[in-house]
UniProtKB/Swiss-Prot annotation:
Cited SUPFAM superfamilies: An anticodon-binding domain of class I aminoacyl-tRNA synthetases, Nucleotidylyl transferase
Protein name: Glutamate--tRNA ligase
UniProt xrefs under CDD domains: GluRS_core
'HIGH' region, short sequence motif: residues: 9-19
Gene Ontology cellular component terms for the protein in this record: cytosol
Swiss-Prot/TrEMBL keywords: Aminoacyl-tRNA synthetase, ATP-binding, Cytoplasm, Ligase, Nucleotide-binding, Protein biosynthesis
NCBIfam families noted in UniProt: gltX_bact
Subunit structure: Monomer.
Sequence similarity: Belongs to the class-I aminoacyl-tRNA synthetase family. Glutamate--tRNA ligase type 1 subfamily.
Subcellular location: Cytoplasm
Catalytic activity: tRNA(Glu) + L-glutamate + ATP = L-glutamyl-tRNA(Glu) + AMP + diphosphate
Protein source organism: Mesomycoplasma hyopneumoniae (strain 7448)
Length: 467
């Protein structure tokens, strides 16, 4: 049997951290077993779909390096890969379930359903159980009501059964059929519900293994019931633990203190391979506690048995550490491929070399680029206050001896050292006066590099009064 896994998002939003991790674990499992990873789109709820939701899912998966073997647009026997293109298939199978006695029409309106719930609550039943009244009506009454076209189709749950599976992450899990209400498989608008469509899609696409979030545990017994009703082989399920913030709370899209979507990290310029690496360690550990992996080594090392049963903490500091480590190991040429700087390639290379070790993401390069590309016209009050208290001798000597004709980093650096030796000063006493006079700030990269990057025209203008 060929291993086939899937990631099946709804285009109701952009690619979330949790969804990306789910996709990654399914991808790694499939590739570890030389299988296929499928991307399909669960777009049956038109009211919640958003513009570019599907596009965001696909583009950001590709940015992460999670490459589907099949996706919308693929021409295979397993398609189509959008639920909206399979409505006839769902309707046909729902009718089969009715004929076999596993499903039935229900004609309740919303008021009647609310009344049922209130009556059950009054009896101390707080988990709603549908009363199956429509199973008792005559065929004549049923046909009459079907003409009004206001109905749903419900799955008839076998109350005497236990629905069990050996979860790939959590072990044996069971639900009593008596605790599961007869649930809707086809809504009044003719569209399938999630729990029905997902089973049909997984069967049609021959999905063998499914890793997904723990919020789907309660959906699993319903889905198993559909598999059993059709006598289809049930795939193996594994339910991943939640991802938490620093306070131990589940990541929430409403939390504005942490970026929730992959697009945000992409736009910030995080290293995609670093994010891929970091994401894999959110709920999985290698046998030897190794942390740095490239794609191939991660696929080779991935073992689902090492998926955690405990919540995973999204540590932004660790992500920053990963991204910084990856960027620091890149070639300058590779970094330049990801940046749009000046027209001067010599300047660009020197700039990247200057900030490579300190940059966490590509946005950091741009932030520093702005400092040199749009330099300050004057020193601000805070810096001026600091500067006025310093000895100006280093500045005066530097201004009188700097060689503008031969603008060279090494010569600038040597001159600073010579001034230190002449005045017998080092550190802050030597560097701070020159830094403030030339860069208008009291911090930054190595001083000689900062001066060279600002350029001789700007430096000459700033030092003119100190000659």
């Amino acid at each position: 049997m060929k291993i086939r896994t899937r990631y099946a998002p709804s285009p109701t939003g952009f690619l979330h951290i949790g969804g990306a991790r789910t996709a990654l674990f399914n991808y790694l499992f499939a590739k570890h077993h030389n299988g296929d990873f499928i991307l399909r789109i669960e777009d049956s709820d038109n009211s919640r779909n958003i513009k570019d939701g599907e596009k965001s899912q696909i583009e950001n998966l590709l940015w992460l390096g999670i490459i589907p073997d099949e996706k919308p647009g693929s021409e295979t026997k397993f398609g189509p890969y959008r639920q909206s293109e399979k409505l006839e298939r769902y309707q046909k199978l729902a009718q089969e379930l009715i004929k076999k006695g596993f499903a039935y029409y229900a004609f309740d309106n919303q008021e009647e359903l609310e009344l049922q719930k209130k009556e059950q609550i009054a009896k101390g039943i707080f988990s709603f159980r549908y009363d199956q009244n429509w199973l008792k009506i005559s065929d004549q009454e049923k046909q009459k009501r079907l003409k009004n076209k206001h109905f749903v189709i419900r799955f008839k749950v076998d109350k005497a059964k236990n629905f069990c599976w050996n979860d790939l992450v959590r072990g044996q899990i069971c639900f009593e059929g008596s605790a599961i209400s007869d649930w809707v498989i086809i809504k009044s608008d003719g569209f399938p519900t999630y729990n029905f469509a997902v089973v049909v899609d997984d069967f049609d696409m021959e999905i063998s293994h499914i890793f997904r979030g723990e919020e789907h545990i309660s959906n699993t017994p319903k889905q198993i019931g559909i598999y059993q009703a059709f006598n289809w082989k049930t795939p193996k399920f594994g339910h991943l633990t939640i991802i938490t913030d620093k306070n131990g709370k589940k990541l929430s899209k409403r939390d504005k203190n942490l970026f929730q979507f992959i697009e945000d990290y992409k736009n910030q310029g995080y290293h995609s391979e670093a994010f891929f690496n970091f994401l894999a360690l959110l709920g999985w550990t290698s046998p030897d506690s190794q942390e740095f992996f490239d794609h191939k080594s991660l696929i080779k090392a991935f073992d689902y048995k090492r998926l955690s049963k405990a919540p995973s903490y999204f540590d932004i500091e660790k992500l920053n550490w990963f991204s910084k480590s990856y960027i620091s190991k890149m070639t300058v040429d590779k970094i330049l491929e990801n940046l749009e700087l000046s027209d001067n390639q010599i300047w660009n290379r020197f700039f990247v070399e200057t900030f490579q070790k300190s940059s966490i993401k590509y946005a950091d390069f741009y932030k520093n680029f702005e400092f040199f590309h749009r330099p300050k016209q004057e020193m601000d009050e805070k810096m001026l206050e600091i500067f006025e208290k310093l000895d100006k001798k280093p500045v005066k000597i530097f201004a009188s001896r700097i060689d503008y004709q031969n603008w060279d980093y090494t010569k600038i650096n040597d001159l600073i050292k010579e001034i230190g030796q002449k005045l017998e000063i080092t550190g802050k006493n030597l560097l701070l006066p020159i830094r403030l006079a030339t860069t208008f700030t009291n911090s930054g990269p190595e001083l000689a590099r900062a001066i060279w990057l600002l350029g001789k025209k700007i430096i000459e203008k700033r030092l003119l009064k100190w000659k």
